[in-house]
Amino acid sequence: EMATIGHIETSDTILNKVLKNAWWGIYGNYKGMPVDCPQRNERQPWLGDRTVGSLGESFVFYNERLYSKWMHDICDAQRSDGNIPDVAPAFWNYYTDDVTWPAALPFTCDMLYHQFGNRQPIIDSYPSIRKWINHILAEYTDENGIITKDKYGDWCVPPEKLELIHSQDPKRKTDGKLIATAYTIRCLQLAEQFANLQGLKEEAKVWADRRSGMIEAFNRQFLTNKAGTSRRPGHVLYPDSIYYGNNTSTANLLALSFGIAPLELRSELIKQVVKGICIDAKEHVNCGVIGISWLLRGLSDNGFPDVAYLLATQRTYPSWGYMAENGATTIWELWNGDKADPKMNSGNHVMLLGDLLTWCYQYLGGIQQKGVNVQQVAEADASVAYKHIVLKPAISIQNCESVKADYETPYGVVKSQWKKTLQHVDWDITVPCNTTADVYLPDGKVETVGSGDYHYSVEIPTRDAAILKDEFLYDYSGFPSAHASTITQLKNGDLVAAYFGGTFERNPDVCIWVSRKPKGAKAWEKPILAADGVYRLGTPEAKKAGLSGIDEKTTPADKGPIKDGLRRFGVPAGYKYDFRSKSANIKLPANLKRKSCWNPVLYTMPDGEIWLFYKVGSTVGDWTGCLVKSKDGGKTWSDPEALPDGFLGPIKNKPEMVNGRLICGSSTEKNGWRFHVEILDLKTNKWKYVGPVDAELKPRTDDVDSATVDMEHPIYKEGEKARLIYSIQPSILKLKDGRLQVLMRTHNAKLATSFSSDGGDTWTPVTLLDIENNQSGTDAVTLKDGRHVLIYNNFETLPGTKKGSRTPLSLAISDDGTHWRHLLTLEDSPINQYSYPGIIEGKDGKLHCIYTWRRQRVAYKEVDLKKIK
């Protein structure tokens, strides 16, 4: 038995399952030495599996003796010429003269010293390390100063086809010479540290000089540096052409993690890594064994712990969570272990853990050491064996709500347990005897404390002083995805928000949900089901439920939640629907069918009644406009009523009341994007349809070449590329001269606008404004002082593309509705997406902003314009 010395639990259930699987995988592969896969006739102590993995394992198990013994095994297996095998003890004759696998010797010696304070493995192994490095330098350094020998590359990178074991795509492969040279540079750095530790100053200088020379050679050989080439300068997903090798994440991570990259280039290099993950890999892991060893720490070290957390909690392929979601109880050898060729496909292999465990303890738990960065590069006076602890959890990760971590250092147990909202954290720590700790608080303060137990209750500053409240409408809900939010304020100051939520947009289980925040409350109330898309066949309501109708082939009603099912349809009171299993506990009659719900819009009528407009349909072209009402501040909602045939109501953004008429900005998408207005006369209760409104001819971004520089060139006013401005989802402004103005989403990289001088009955042809649009929804509001505020993604869609990035999300302000300036950034993480916002001005002049947060939740911010600098 080997003692478990570390425990960690997070607010994410899938990550917790992965951590449990990691424990079992490591535990099952300790057999007097660290070995691999028990199910095939191998069971070998591969060095490369533990080059970095031993550090993560040391947070979980008391493995000092096992790894100290293994260092002797490796040294004993070394050949007389300095060659260290890939497997030690050398049961197999695998002396390939690789760098990354034998690097386990110096890397693990370093781990044993810093984690446990045991310097003896360094002293005992140093002659072998010296001999091995000199052998590599002598045999495999070419005329350019590059190490040419590499066996495995970035082993087991996620392949382009699930049945493959290894990728055949050259874009996914990292140059073996780059990997070997980078690891040699790191080993030279460790050799320098080991020499200094033993007082071998002259030898340390030799290692330092060789490392310096090899860094210069590495940058000459592998660095591309073309500054000023970004298509969107400053945007994290559009870096300059500055990268290493063929721009794999692994190549750039090694340069960043091993101190190779020039300081002035680090910000662009990490952007390349982030772009590779968020855009090219669609927010998934894109590394093999080498890159994954540095991925999470590399992201966090360089300002992107949120991207690291995204990868750590991802559930789909390729990810650790994908393994756990598909039956794994340990860690697979391959990212696609459930689909790949069984010739090399272990179900119990720990090499792909990379730096996950280390990152969880050091970043989520925040348990680090003074003077030792997360790559274990130590300063001269660095802490050893946690004599001086650093407690610095990544509390800035918005969707990580809590962490409980403890780790038994040689001095005793250190604990770090925290729970937070976006603006407040409660944090309990324990500092063991005979140690000190630097405690990094989220408000910027740092306290140095001695041994003992401490509790901190600290406010978390928002990203700008003008943001008074930063909240999620809910932490957890039954539905996994939410989108298209809207907000209104009642006369008593209560806030009511609505959004659609379900498996994902278009899924028939998507319903309309409402969240309330009473005035003075600290948190939003639990989501309320306000409307569904359920109908009974043969009823007038079903007949109106979409252009394609509802019939026997339509999705059964028990494929989603039902509002007031007992009263409306006689559904048993105990009916429940589970989004995860996509099943209900009760089978419903076959004549009950459902369609998806879309785009809610809230409006508080003059008498205080809340109207909630929404749409029902299988697709956008199938929409039927619907309405539910609430007389009790959004606590309960009426049965749905369909709008008159052909009317959809306000399509995304709030309407405006003008002279007793409700002016609803609307649009259609069935035969091209066309803007129109729907007007409800409250006296007569009759609807009027205005439009579709004419538009100018302009080129769309997806119709022009990617090299296009000037989309206003006269050539685009004629010919096949000159099309009507397609515009949808208008928001309505009230101008100082009495006119109405709409702002709209387009395909043209700019927002569109139109004006009405007669209260909405007629509108000018649609034109473009000089303010960017990413082909995503916006909202705007006219303030009491006559100014206007826009909430939008301030990203201009690139020529040759259909849509732009849905990050950042910002506010802009205008005096006249035509000329706008950027005011405040609300979100700027590279993780997609922050979109479909809503905005209102509160009774006290504060702005209430609401928006989709990564399609997972709905976020809310209260903004005080007076505090914007």
Feature annotation, model-predicted:
Residues 3-21, 27-30, 34-52, 56-85, ...:
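Active-site acid/base region of carbohydrate-active enzymes
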Residues 34-47, 90-102, 161-183, 220-252, ...:
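Solvent-exposed loop and edge beta-strand segments that line ligand/cofactor-binding
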Residues 52-63, 105-121, 183-201, 253-264, ...:
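Well-ordered alpha-helical scaffold segments within catalytic/enzyme domains
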Residues 63-166, 173, 316-337, 516-546, ...:
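Helix-terminus loop motifs that line ligand-binding clefts
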Residues 74, 78, 128-131, 210-214, ...:
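Active/binding-pocket-proximal capping segment
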Residues 128, 148, 157-162, 171, ...:
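Asp-box/BNR beta-propeller blade signature and adjacent active/binding-site loops
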Residues 225, 243-338, 343-344, 770, ...:
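Extracellular polysaccharide-recognition and catalytic grooves
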Residues 306-461:
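Non-catalytic C-terminal accessory modules of carbohydrate-active enzymes
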